[in-house]
């Protein structure tokens, strides 16, 4: 009984440590796509997903809408 309790506590601490290691320090990177033409929401999202497995959205820039892609940085 005592061995199984100690083992269970050890496994919980181990799993929590692994989860913390995975999420700690993960930064998000950004890149602008479709600079030469006006942004289309569906095209922007598709390009970002294909290129970086990220999320893309259009935002108003000075003269036109630009595509901003946000994705997890590679370490």
From Swiss-Prot:
InterPro entries: DEFL (IPR010851). Residues 1-25 form the signal peptide. Disulfide bonds join 29-73, 39-58, 44-67, 48-69. GO terms for biological process: defense response to fungus; killing of cells of another organism. Its main location: secreted. Transmembrane segments: none annotated. The keyword Glycosyltransferase does not apply. It is found in: Secreted. Keywords: Antimicrobial, Disulfide bond, Fungicide, Plant defense, Secreted, Signal. It holds the Pfam family SLR1-BP. One of its GO terms (cellular component) is extracellular region. It comes from the Eukaryota. Belongs to the DEFL family. This is Putative defensin-like protein 119. It comes from Arabidopsis thaliana.
């Amino acid at each position: 009984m005592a061995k199984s309790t100690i083992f269970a506590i050890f496994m919980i601490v181990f799993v929590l440590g692994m989860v913390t290691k995975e999420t700690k320090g993960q930064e998000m990177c950004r890149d602008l796509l479709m600079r030469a033409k006006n942004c289309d929401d569906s095209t922007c999202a598709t390009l970002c997903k294909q290129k970086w497995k990220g999320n893309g959205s259009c935002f108003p820039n000075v003269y036109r809408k630009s595509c901003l892609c946000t994705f997890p940085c590679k370490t």
